[in-house]
């Protein structure tokens, strides 16, 4: 691994290690595996309505999504370009992945509920196009910001190189209700 990639990888680890953690209160700052699976289920039910194949929860996508949610929370910066101005492609490369396709949805202050997030994303044309995009893998991160008590969300969507060809969907009115 080159010195640059090693330095970036160490920085990536530092961001993950510096993120908020669950404390003794009732507030859950990080998304739980049950919530991640619930969001995946909502995505796949939606994709099924449009005759798209389901996605699977992917550990690498989840790691990249969590780290970006932590970065947005710590920096209070809502952006697809994260630390060192890295986008989702560069963040996936840090974990050793070079997906065929990649997409990212981010959000701020929607709240902790998965259904509220899905409703907000699906009513946005740009987010909906990602949810219904050519992806077969999915990962999500949610962090309660320690500075502002708002929720920072990030979802990473990808298709592995050489994976099956996922069809495009023609966008129209939303036919899904959450």
Each model region followed by its residue ranges:
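Surface-exposed patches in mature extracellular/periplasmic domains of secreted proteins
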Residues: 27-28, 49-63, 76-86, 128-143
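Short hydrophobic helices that act as membrane-entry/anchoring signals
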Residues: 2-17
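Short, surface-exposed glycine/acidic/tryptophan-bearing loops
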Residues: 62-111
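Extracytoplasmic
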Residues: 34, 52, 101, 133-137, ...
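Disulfide-stabilized extracellular recognition modules
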Residues: 107-178
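A short alpha-helix/helix-coil micro-patch that ends at or immediately precedes a cysteine
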Residues: 15-75
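Solvent-exposed, polar/charged alpha-helical surfaces in well-ordered, non-transmembrane soluble domains
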Residues: 37-45, 62-70, 90, 104, ...
């Amino acid at each position: 691994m080159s010195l640059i990639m090693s330095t970036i990888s160490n920085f990536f680890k530092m961001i993950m290690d510096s993120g908020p953690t669950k404390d003794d209160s009732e507030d859950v700052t990080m998304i739980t595996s049950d919530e991640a699976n619930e969001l995946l289920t909502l995505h796949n039910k939606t994709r099924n309505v449009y005759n798209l194949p389901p996605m699977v929860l992917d550990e690498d996508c989840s790691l990249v999504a969590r780290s970006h949610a932590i970065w947005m929370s710590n920096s209070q910066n809502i952006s697809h370009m994260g630390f060192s101005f890295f986008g989702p492609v560069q963040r996936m490369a840090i974990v050793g992945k070079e997906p065929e396709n990649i997409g990212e949805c981010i959000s701020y202050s929607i709240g902790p509920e998965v259904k509220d997030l899905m409703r907000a994303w699906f009513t946005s044309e740009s987010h909906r196009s990602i949810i219904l995009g050519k992806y077969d893998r999915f990962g999500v991160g949610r962090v309660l910001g320690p500075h502002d008590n708002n929720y920072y969300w990030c979802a990473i969507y990808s298709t592995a190189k050489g994976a099956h060809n996922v069809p495009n969907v023609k966008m129209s009115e939303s036919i899904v209700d959450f």
